[in-house]
Amino acid sequence: MDVQSVLIGALLMDDQLAPYSLPELSIEHFRPELQPTFAAVQGFWITKGILDIMQIVAKYPDQKQNLMSCVSSCESECIRITRDRVEEWTRIIMEDAAKVRFQSLAFKAVDAATAFDDLPDLYQQMGQALDIHTEKGDFQSVGELLDDYIRHLD
């Protein structure tokens, strides 16, 4: 399953789930061919507060094929789109991006051109690359608190 395409497609199909994913992600989390598509979706959501594929295509016509492909990828998975799934896919995308950053730094660390004095800084960057948690405030909406409370009752 192409998690990146499926997530974008899921958000286009149900924009009520966008707040559980889009604030956590950035363009760097996506592979190069999907970066413009994600940027179009995220930018439209930030400015308009909704995700309407027709309006997004009208604003970004060069992304039409990628947007439709993402929706098709999501539909072909035949899975129910829920908040939990969107959060899971978001976490997977963030973890994959962190792993790629870590691997890139690891290759740089073993490169013959890297000096010994550069290693402590590289190791620190490797540790930071694995930190996928974004800085959030202590604020939780009543809806989130209620959701968490109900989930713990089950």
What residues fall within each predicted segment?
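Noncatalytic partner-interaction/assembly domains of nucleic-acid and motor enzyme complexes
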Residues: M1-A97
